[in-house]
Amino acid sequence: MTRTAKLTIIPPGKPLSGRAMPPGSKSITNRALLLAGLAKGTSRLTGALKSDDTRYMADALRAMGVAIDEPDDTTFVVTGSGRLTPPKAPLFLGNAGTATRFLTAAAALVDGTVIVDGDEHMRKRPIGPLVEAMRKLGIDVSAETGCPPVTVRGTGRFEADRILIDGGLSSQYVSALLMMAAGGDRPVDIELVGEDIGALGYIDLTTAAMKAFGAKVEKTSPVTWRVEPTGYRAADFVIEPDASAATYLWAAEVLSDGRIDLGVPNDAFTQPDAKAYETIAKFPHLPAEIDGSQMQDAVPTIAVLAAFNETPVRFVGIANLRVKECDRIRALSSGLNNIREGLAVEEGDDLIVHSDPALAGQTLPAEIDTFADHRIAMSFALAGLKIGGITILDPDCVGKTFPAYWRTLATLGVTYRDKD
């Protein structure tokens, strides 16, 4: 397939309007795929996301003996035996952080050796804290560089019953350990420590999905969970639309003074990034300081929106954005300053956007380096709704989580010029 090298957004001459349903949640789809793969029996996952990230997860599970059928564009039918088997080759997961971290932990339940690997971007993303936490349970696991590839020599048995992990690190580590623990041989307590507890909402997503597949997990304190060794049972599971994807549509609506029907009430989302709706709705009077710690994937959306705000905006609690698909703080400041020098500045791990509503209606030719990051591409497309000359490099990277993004904007009234 030929990839599009560049895509220039042409600012629409009228408000965007129409119906645009976000795809299924990536976060929930990958959790449900793993839990269904660990379960005994056949599960039906509906409303699922079919994208690069979820295909990596599905293919890895197939390599470990799970049967997965795809009867339509939003359904997975998953049949597991209750145990994963050692794959014949290393699991290649591209730059899919959820799949990599979740499967690294799940590999401990395999009776044999599993190598979890990814592309050149994934090989720069840290996984050391998860590896260390697994070692505390007596699991034989190694990652020489602190990043993938990771080698796990599993047995399905643990030598300890308690894990302490820094709550300021990626919530994906905690979710990975929780899902793994239910497949072990003894109850396990998982406790977050440290002053900064980030992205608790994603942990809530994990425990809700675990319970739907028969696990017994109890929150024994605000930062502690006890997981019983119940294993998982097959279930039919409905996946809600992706709240992170919805943020682009909410922002497009307020930027264009349009009316976009997402097909789902804003308060129906259970994902943490849905919190962004209340913030986005305040545009062009966004708060002077926005804490992104509990809605991390929405920060790029709001940061680009902030460029057109009435007053400057400081983003705090976003240090983890430096170890996403790219250094998103650096990518955001670079892209905004490429539009106009001085539009953004980094102060430590904070990002300050020096908003200027007068940007709207100007022509400021700028090529935006996406760093192969889907969220950078989708967020900076929003700038192109108000500024002429915004060109997105490697626009096809949106296939990671929202393959139909450009087509969706087009149905709402956005047009493009592309160059292969």
Swiss-Prot record:
InterPro entries: Enolpyruvate_Tfrase_dom, Enolpyruvate_Tfrase_sf, EPSP_synthase, EPSP_synthase_CS, RNA3'P_cycl/enolpyr_Trfase_a/b. Pathway: Metabolic intermediate biosynthesis; chorismate biosynthesis; chorismate from D-erythrose 4-phosphate and phosphoenolpyruvate: step 6/7. Its EC number is 2.5.1.19. The keyword Lipoprotein does not apply. It catalyses: 3-phosphoshikimate + phosphoenolpyruvate = 5-O-(1-carboxyvinyl)-3-phosphoshikimate + phosphate. GO terms for cellular component: cytoplasm. SUPFAM superfamilies: EPT/RTPC-like (SSF55205). 3-phosphoshikimate binds at residues 26-27, 31, 170-172, 297, 320, 324. It holds the Pfam family EPSP_synthase. It is found in: Cytoplasm. PROSITE patterns: EPSP_SYNTHASE_1 (PS00104). The active site is at 297 (proton acceptor). GO terms for biological process: amino acid biosynthetic process; aromatic amino acid family biosynthetic process; chorismate biosynthetic process. The keyword DNA damage does not apply. Phosphoenolpyruvate binds at residues 26, 97, 125, 172, 328, 375, 400. GO terms for molecular function: 3-phosphoshikimate 1-carboxyvinyltransferase activity. Keywords: Amino-acid biosynthesis, Aromatic amino acid biosynthesis, Cytoplasm, Transferase. NCBIfam families: aroA. Monomer. Belongs to the EPSP synthase family. Catalyzes the transfer of the enolpyruvyl moiety of phosphoenolpyruvate (PEP) to the 5-hydroxyl of shikimate-3-phosphate (S3P) to produce enolpyruvyl shikimate-3-phosphate and inorganic phosphate. This is 3-phosphoshikimate 1-carboxyvinyltransferase. It comes from Rhizobium etli (strain ATCC 51251 / DSM 11541 / JCM 21823 / NBRC 15573 / CFN 42). The gene is aroA.
